[in-house]
Amino acid sequence: GEETRRYTNIIFGDVYLLAGQSNMEAWLSWIDSQNYAGEKERAENSNIRTIDLLSKGGNGSSNPSDNLPEIEGNAWAPMTFSNANTTSAIGYYFAQELNKETGRPIGYIHAAVGGTRIDRWLENDYVEGISSPWSLYNNRVYPLRKFKLSGVLYYQGESDGPEDADSLDSSKGMSADQYSTIMAALIDNYRELFNNENLPFYYAQLARYSNQNFENIRAAQVWALDKVTNPNYVRMVSNLDEVGNFGSVGNTSGNARHDIHPYGKDEVARRFALLAKHDIYGYTDSSVTGPQYKSMETDGDKLILTFEADGDLDILDKDCYADYKTDELIESDKLDVTVLNGFEIAGEDGIYYSANAEIKGKTVILSCDE
């Protein structure tokens, strides 16, 4: 006989995959508790749907799986204040922003797992010698291969940094070359899996944290932009200014300035959304990058560095310095935060000296007294 099935409450929209570790996983009610209470009215939005895997299958799998880990309740749950409690804060703010600006239904699959290294997020041996018996690619990414994703948001790298804050020794963490190679391969891997060589892939650069040495991972995240096979629609969101009391976040105690989980997830999500609006939805007035180094020329005894930027360059506000060492230098008047710090120049002998740096428009002019 004939069988009739009826499906209701179905919407068609754009689907995003959220992957990485705890800064992507971080729940709205945990990372942004003061703002969460004020989201009660806006959170009720049936045009935003989520699959929140949470801890289900968080140990990964040694073999590719055809199905996602089984979850309780509605697989594509409409956004409610209750659901917002345990969803990714970045995913929540990102979806709300896109839905408001474009009017399109937005769905996202929240697959991130805290404390995970990059080797768990790509296909085993996609990069020779890089594999994990606890692969999250196998049970959280591979099962989605038939989805037509609009894009991927990725925030990861803390667990691949050196354990010794004063070491760049790759035995204590990944070298910049290692991580950038694997990061670029991960992007290629996902684009192959989803059969879309131009799949938008946006990832977050690590924020500064305490005195932890993440310079190698942050450098690697920049280098990956040049190593990926096809750079189209591969973009990095910089979070160097992201600390606990950013923008609309209500934390003003200062403690979050030294938290490995920056509280301003609404701002990170806004930056991700700017990229999506530009690349996917055709918003030509959206910014797509912070300042990016473009070229260098000499002018007598000076070096002139030119950057690509939407506006003129500026010095980071002193309240955005987020590591203990820098705070101590500021408090003891050993660091002048009204001038541009951090540039060094080397001569033919290869010895680097601190450089004087002056901002002029989109350029930085360097000189050295040595």
Where are these regions (language model features)?
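Cell-envelope and extracellular/periplasmic
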Residues: G1-E370
